[in-house]
Amino acid sequence: MEAEKMELKLYNTMTQQKEVLIPITPGKIGLYVCGITAYDFSHIGHARAAVSFDVLYRYLKHLDYDVTFVRNFTDVDDKIIDRANKNGEDPLDLSNRFCDEYLVDMGALQCLPPTHQPRVSEHMDNIIKMIEKIIEKDCGYVVEGDVFFSVDKSPNYGKLSGQLLEHTRAGERVAVDSRKRNPADFALWKAAKPDEPSWESPWGPGRPGWHIECSAMSVHYLSPKFDIHGGGADLKFPHHENEIAQTCAACEDSGVNYWLHNGHVTINNEKMAKSKHNFKTIREITASYHPLALRHFLMSAQYRSPLSFTASQLESSSEALYYVYQTLQDLDEGLSPYQDALSEDGGKSEQTAEGKDIIKKLKTEFESKMLDDLNTAHILTGAYQDALKFINASLSKLKKMQKKQRMSMLVSLVEIEKAAREVLDVLGLLTTLSYAEILKEMKLKTLIRAEIGEEGISQLIEERITARKNKDFAKSDEIREKLTRKGIALMDIGKETVWRPCFPSQADSST
């Protein structure tokens, strides 16, 4: 699929409207996303940002764009230093450790590695050179080894966030310092303090301010002017506002064409944040839920909308994905006896009219939602569910069909599976594991949540079989209901009883 044939509309925070994506260089996209400050395990608010922009990255690639994706690590920061001092640990060792832990989480969530993942500590020369340019342009000033940016020299300051300069007050996300010319001025360089990491600079030893880091790295890996800049909604002010001011001051031809911001994850109607001590780490959630279920949950609302975290929502995502993979596994098993026939046919047989229609609707609905500002909410419902229902209904009919009719149906099912897999792949919900392996992993997570092992379930199944033989149906129902409350459904197939995950009949609203 050629990118030019489909118009992707993205909501641009700067203009507050959806705009058609028109790259600076045809066929190529430069994308910069602000990464984490690495001092602790990442929470699912961080996961929301990562998954949101991973979906964008994947979809741009799906549209055949050549994407240069940069996501940084802040490994030099006050929070890192404070945590390292409490731990009695070197700040860079601490941040390196949590950068690595973050990458483990990203792998679990199926987030593709960006083209570049720079760390602040590795780009001091770029940062210092940019600060020098800002001072040369009379937009920065030095005070006792510190360097501040003069916001009065930035005529468009506040345009992105809607924060008027005269309304900006010290103490409101703005550091209080009487040496500043304007309370809203912010640090480009901080003079060294005892027992803190520092680097040599023209203004003496010190370390960079937070905002200059992203300006320097985006210019270094992309250019002063690039296509898309992303991050969490909380970064609009002051971080992104300050980035714009710095880059414009240092570079004549600069700017970002599209500013994208993902919504917060909330818990009990409050933004999830480490500072509020109300966060759930990615590692904590994936200990009892499959990472794909967490990813599905994070895509269950349009990326700009707030997302309310509840256990019941995670259970819903887990159940929805299990159904998808169980259907695809059933399809694999159903097609297995006909592989030789499909090979011999060699594509001679045509798809059924209904099969073609199913695929067309699936693809059309998927593309229309994604092209409309990456609207992943309910993306695996509608036409996608119709495709799954068609698979399930068709598998039971295969043996009864005449050869020619059966071959057309087999070809249709193969093509429907390809279309279903493509959607999963673009959404990052497809792994290198087989369907059976993913289902096995999801069942294991169900057992962890239910606090019961395979042996415990087997024992309860045997007790239920005995109860049914004795016509003790009250006992039989009690066992079934007990397991259903834990998210385990029993199914009687012939003389055999098997289990699969289900939505718990009494799911808690939070975890």
UniProtKB/Swiss-Prot annotation:
Enzyme Commission number, as recorded: 6.1.1.16
GO molecular function, one term: metal ion binding
The keyword Nucleotide-binding is assigned to this record: yes
SUPFAM superfamilies per record: Anticodon-binding domain of a subclass of class I aminoacyl-tRNA synthetases, Nucleotidylyl transferase
Binding annotation for ATP: K274
Motif ('KMSKS' region): 271-275
Catalytic activity: tRNA(Cys) + L-cysteine + ATP = L-cysteinyl-tRNA(Cys) + AMP + diphosphate
Co-factor remark: Binds 1 zinc ion per subunit.
Cellular-component GO terms for this entry: cytosol
Keywords per UniProt: Aminoacyl-tRNA synthetase, ATP-binding, Cytoplasm, Ligase, Metal-binding, Nucleotide-binding, Protein biosynthesis, Repeat, TPR repeat, Zinc
Cofactor: Zn(2+)
Localisation per UniProt entry: Cytoplasm, Cytosol
Primary localization class, coarse: cytoplasm
One Gene Ontology biological process: cysteinyl-tRNA aminoacylation
Source organism superkingdom: Eukaryota
Short sequence motif 'HIGH' region: positions: 36-46
Ligand binding (Zn(2+)): C34, C214, H239, E243
TPR repeats: 315-348, 368-401
Family classification: Belongs to the class-I aminoacyl-tRNA synthetase family.
Protein name from the UniProt record: Cysteine--tRNA ligase 2, cytoplasmic
